[in-house]
């Protein structure tokens, strides 16, 4: 019963990515029809009664079957690649003429699919991942979610590398790479130690004159917040300070965006550490227009609602949980030695997201769409948006062991970095503008609609990883391809 529950729970629609699931469905057909010699070959019957001869016959056909499967899979990825290119063309036409009403074939098939800022060489990426994961050689396990996720990641890296190789210094190329913190750069709740393998990769990217940003939910305002971020990134910051691989200009290309999009820090050579950047130097116009009283009201109402949920689920004992309220975020965290049930975390993040919809509907100058999104990934973040300039973006998300509500989201965090860096006169605007197609966000929270890192898809190309080890692997690939220029 427990095993069945876990399987069914994991397969809930709100935990799926529709685009990946759709590709999985396409790949299931050739797997069923071509991945087993018995499915299309009758010669096996001659050897069926002799187990040894039958086994030898199957082994003799392994290569042929794998090649057939690979070709079938390649055909599918080639077709999906064309659909992505068509979607990019239609999106560009709509950007030029908003009255253009045609919808791309891909968006008709997968309505929830987001925008693609670069073409995706999926066929090439599939061959790369097939050589690593032996997808075509499998007979009992069909192409999986992680297979498709890895192929999409590799395709994005290949696309950015090709753009980088084809450009000159002032042309369109990869300029900014941002990262989530927990589970992406370091283990959940941990920090970057001096021996972390990802540090070498980050230093190499900085030495290539790329901007590196850490866009994290952890929010510590002001210069007084520097020690907390230093504690999280100590290994990297110490290495940047002392390494001869970087010049002073490159050292200051490290930035940290805290609280999703609320607090900006930058490495400063004089400080030898991070320096807090005042909001008026980097806030986007939409963020500057937000009413502080309205923000306080959102925080106060959410605080009250969290206390209600804390009491409702009997989490209000002093040894169980604590509600922490900051300037632009509020959350409920477990006390040492206690663990909040996964179901309670999901209930709380769903409840908070719905409460936020109500709050924003009451406070917005223009009515907020009250339709709750069809797919809510309660293990991730739920973000609310409206076209109105005064509408405050709010993000409710599950950090894995706690639940937080932040003002802003990572789409604003990444976009703020893009705009802020172009204000720096020392770059003589050679890097400007930093386009969405020239930015890459790497994170672990992309499942379904409204997730924490999911929002970064609005402002940059993305890579979906599942562990710091995967981050190192994808950066190795990226550096290798960029260095081939």
Curated annotation (Swiss-Prot):
<feature type="binding site">
    <location>
        <position position="180"/>
    </location>
    <ligand>
        <name>Mg(2+)</name>
    </ligand>
</feature>
<comment type="subunit">
    <text>Homotetramer.</text>
</comment>
<comment type="function">
    <text>IMP-specific 5'-nucleotidase involved in IMP (inositol monophosphate) degradation.</text>
</comment>
<dbReference type="GO" id="GO:0005524">
    <property type="term" value="F:ATP binding"/>
</dbReference>
<feature type="active site" description="Nucleophile">
    <location>
        <position position="180"/>
    </location>
</feature>
<dbReference type="GO" id="GO:0050483">
    <property type="term" value="F:IMP 5'-nucleotidase activity"/>
</dbReference>
<dbReference type="GO" id="GO:0006190">
    <property type="term" value="P:inosine salvage"/>
</dbReference>
<keyword id="KW-0547">Nucleotide-binding</keyword>
<feature type="binding site">
    <location>
        <position position="180"/>
    </location>
    <ligand>
        <name>IMP</name>
    </ligand>
</feature>
<protein>
    <recommendedName>
        <fullName>IMP-specific 5'-nucleotidase 1</fullName>
        <ecNumber>3.1.3.99</ecNumber>
    </recommendedName>
</protein>
<feature type="binding site">
    <location>
        <position position="182"/>
    </location>
    <ligand>
        <name>IMP</name>
    </ligand>
</feature>
<keyword id="KW-0378">Hydrolase</keyword>
<dbReference type="GO" id="GO:0009117">
    <property type="term" value="P:nucleotide metabolic process"/>
</dbReference>
<keyword id="KW-0546">Nucleotide metabolism</keyword>
<keyword id="KW-0479">Metal-binding</keyword>
<feature type="binding site">
    <location>
        <position position="132"/>
    </location>
    <ligand>
        <name>ATP</name>
    </ligand>
</feature>
<feature type="binding site">
    <location>
        <position position="410"/>
    </location>
    <ligand>
        <name>IMP</name>
    </ligand>
</feature>
<dbReference type="GO" id="GO:0071592">
    <property type="term" value="P:nicotinic acid riboside biosynthetic process"/>
</dbReference>
<dbReference type="GO" id="GO:0071590">
    <property type="term" value="P:nicotinamide riboside biosynthetic process"/>
</dbReference>
<keyword id="KW-0067">ATP-binding</keyword>
<dbReference type="GO" id="GO:0000287">
    <property type="term" value="F:magnesium ion binding"/>
</dbReference>
<dbReference type="InterPro" id="IPR009453">
    <property type="entry name" value="ISN1"/>
</dbReference>
<dbReference type="Pfam" id="PF06437">
    <property type="entry name" value="ISN1"/>
</dbReference>
<feature type="binding site">
    <location>
        <position position="402"/>
    </location>
    <ligand>
        <name>IMP</name>
    </ligand>
</feature>
<feature type="binding site">
    <location>
        <position position="182"/>
    </location>
    <ligand>
        <name>Mg(2+)</name>
    </ligand>
</feature>
<feature type="binding site">
    <location>
        <position position="444"/>
    </location>
    <ligand>
        <name>Mg(2+)</name>
    </ligand>
</feature>
<comment type="similarity">
    <text>Belongs to the ISN1 family.</text>
</comment>
<feature type="binding site">
    <location>
        <position position="188"/>
    </location>
    <ligand>
        <name>IMP</name>
    </ligand>
</feature>
<feature type="active site" description="Proton donor">
    <location>
        <position position="182"/>
    </location>
</feature>
<feature type="binding site">
    <location>
        <position position="216"/>
    </location>
    <ligand>
        <name>IMP</name>
    </ligand>
</feature>
<keyword id="KW-0460">Magnesium</keyword>
């Amino acid at each position: 019963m427990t095993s069945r529950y876990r399987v069914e729970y994991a397969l809930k629609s709100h935990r799926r990515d529709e685009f990946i699931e759709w590709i999985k469905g396409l790949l299931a057909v050739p797997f069923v029809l071509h991945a087993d010699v018995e499915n299309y070959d009758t010669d096996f019957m001659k050897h069926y009664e002799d187990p040894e001869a039958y086994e030898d016959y199957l082994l003799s056909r392994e290569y042929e079957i794998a090649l057939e499967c690979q070709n079938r899979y390649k055909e599918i990825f080639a077709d999906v690649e064309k659909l992505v290119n068509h979607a990019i063309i239609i999106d560009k036409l709509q950007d030029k003429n908003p009255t253009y009403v045609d919808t791309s074939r891909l968006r008709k098939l997968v309505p929830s699919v987001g925008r693609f800022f670069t073409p995706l060489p999926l066929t090439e990426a599939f061959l790369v991942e097939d050589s690593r994961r032996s997808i075509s050689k499998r007979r009992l396990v069909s192409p999986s979610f992680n297979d498709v996720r890895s192929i999409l990641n590799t395709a994005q890296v290949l696309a950015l590398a090709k753009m980088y190789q084809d450009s000159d210094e002032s042309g369109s190329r990869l300029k900014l790479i941002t990262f989530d913190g927990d589970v992406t750069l370091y283990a959940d709740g941990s920090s970057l130690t001096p021996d972390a393998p990802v540090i070498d990769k980050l230093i190499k990217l900085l030495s290539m004159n790329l901007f590196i940003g850490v866009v994290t939910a952890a929010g510590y305002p002001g210069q007084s917040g520097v020690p907390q971020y230093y504690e999280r990134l100590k290994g990297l910051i110490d290495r940047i300070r002392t390494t001869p691989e970087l010049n002073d200009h490159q050292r200051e290309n490290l930035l940290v965006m805290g609280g999703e999009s609320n607090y900006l820090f930058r490495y400063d050579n004089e400080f030898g550490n991070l320096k807090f950047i005042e909001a008026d130097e980097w806030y986007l116009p939409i963020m500057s227009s937000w009413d502080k009283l309205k923000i306080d009201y959102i925080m106060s109402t959410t605080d009250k609602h969290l206390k209600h949920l804390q009491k409702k689920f009997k989490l209000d004992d002093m040894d169980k949980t604590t509600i922490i309220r900051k300037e632009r975020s509020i959350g409920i965290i477990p006390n040492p030695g206690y663990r909040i049930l996964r179901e309670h975390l999901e209930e709380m993040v769903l409840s908070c997201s719905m409460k936020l919809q109500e709050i924003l509907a009451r406070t917005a100058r223009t009515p907020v769409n009250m339709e709750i999104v069809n797919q809510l990934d309660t293990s991730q973040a739920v973000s609310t948006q409206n076209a109105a300039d005064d509408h405050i973006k709010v993000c409710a998300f599950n950090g894995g062991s706690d639940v937080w509500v932040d003002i802003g989201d990572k789409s604003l965090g990444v976009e703020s970095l893009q705009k802020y860096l172009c204000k720096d006169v020392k770059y003589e605007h050679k890097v400007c503008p930093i386009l969405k197609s020239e930015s890459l966000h790497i994170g672990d929270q992309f499942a379904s609609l409204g997730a924490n890192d999911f929002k970064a898809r609005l402002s940059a190309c993305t890579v979906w990883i599942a562990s710091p080890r995967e981050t190192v692997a994808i950066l190795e690939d990226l550096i290798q391809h960029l260095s081939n220029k």
